[in-house]
């Protein structure tokens, strides 16, 4: 694959507003390429290279940090892939996907005017404002990865819809549950936030002003959602606790699902590893 200049790639990824600003960032030592500081703006780098900026917040919202943690933990590479982001809001997940080289992102949210301007004007972003994902039967093209950060709706409802957007996974060896193995060409995947406050029953959600602290409820919610995902054709490949708490201090989790791929069904093992008392 042909390499490209670092300053041009920074602009293309949306990490710098102009080539001049990209060059300034590089000369200031604020750009890392695959973890290493690069001081030449003209350096030839791979289009799939990981680029990191060490100045200010990395993403337009804290959601980007949550998704980054999941991508790192699961070993999922999004470079060159077509993605959809459900519940985009300000665009933290979308921003993270673009910074990691996504070719295109369908940014979907029921609200309007929420998406950060730099994402709203990025040609790689298809803005889908005032759009309720549960009623979107299909997208203009099949996507390889769907990220979900939705509130006031069960993830189970959304999984029933987004599986119709995904490109089917080709046959592949079955990796050990919880290990990496994601990457280009692996087919349809989902990385979704599981929010117990929107999955538990009304009685549980009403306690403590909507903050669920009971590990027993966390376990029940995770087991229920992941078992449902399996029943709908998703293999559960990984599960982590979000590095950041949700609104009001709720514990949240990130699940990695692959569509139409065999699973060895060790949900109980994964759930046990992320429960708060085991952290």
Which sequence ranges carry the predicted segments?
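S-adenosyl-L-methionine
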Residues: 103-158, 163-164
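Intrinsic disorder/low-complexity segments
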Residues: 167-188
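Conserved class I S-adenosyl-L-methionine
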Residues: 79-89
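Flexible, glycine-/basic-rich loop-and-beta segments that form/coincide
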Residues: 251, 256-279
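Residues at the N-terminus of the alpha-helix immediately C-terminal to the conserved SAM/SAH-binding loop
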Residues: 89-94, 111
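A basic, amphipathic helix-loop patch mediating RNA/tRNA/ribosome contacts
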Residues: 1-49, 82-83
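Conserved S-adenosyl-L-methionine
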Residues: 96-104
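Short, glycine-/aromatic-enriched active-site segment of Class I SAM-dependent methyltransferases
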Residues: 196-213
């Amino acid at each position: 694959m042909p390499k490209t200049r670092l300053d041009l790639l920074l602009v293309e990824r949306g990490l710098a507003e102009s080539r001049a600003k990209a060059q300034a960032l590089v000369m200031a030592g604020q750009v890392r390429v695959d973890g290493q500081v690069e001081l030449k703006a003209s350096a030839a780098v791979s289009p799939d290279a990981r680029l990191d900026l060490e100045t200010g917040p990395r993403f337009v919202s804290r959601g980007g940090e949550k998704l980054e943690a999941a991508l790192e933990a699961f070993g999922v590479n999004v470079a060159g892939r077509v993605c959809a982001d459900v519940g985009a809001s300000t665009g933290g997940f979308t921003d993270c996907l673009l910074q990691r080289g996504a070719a295109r992102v369908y940014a979907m949210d029921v609200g309007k005017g929420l998406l950060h301007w730099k994402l709203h004007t990025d040609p790689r972003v298809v803005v889908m404002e005032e759009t309720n994902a549960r009623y979107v039967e299909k997208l203009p093209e099949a996507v390889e990865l769907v990220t979900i950060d939705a509130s006031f709706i069960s993830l189970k409802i959304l999984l029933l819809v987004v599986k119709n957007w995904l490109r089917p996974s080709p046959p592949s060896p079955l990796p050990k549950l919880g290990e990496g193995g994601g990457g280009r060409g692996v087919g349809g995947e989902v990385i979704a936030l599981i929010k117990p406050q929107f999955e538990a029953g009304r009685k549980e959600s009403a306690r403590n002003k909507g903050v669920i602290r009971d590990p027993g409820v966390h376990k029940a919610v995770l087991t229920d959602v992941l078992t449902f995902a399996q029943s709908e054709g998703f293999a559960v490949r990984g599960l982590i606790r979000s590095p950041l708490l949700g609104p009001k201090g709720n514990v949240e989790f990130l699940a990695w699902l692959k569509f139409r791929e065999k699973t060895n069904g060790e949900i109980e093992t994964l759930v046990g590893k992320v429960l708060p008392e085991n952290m």
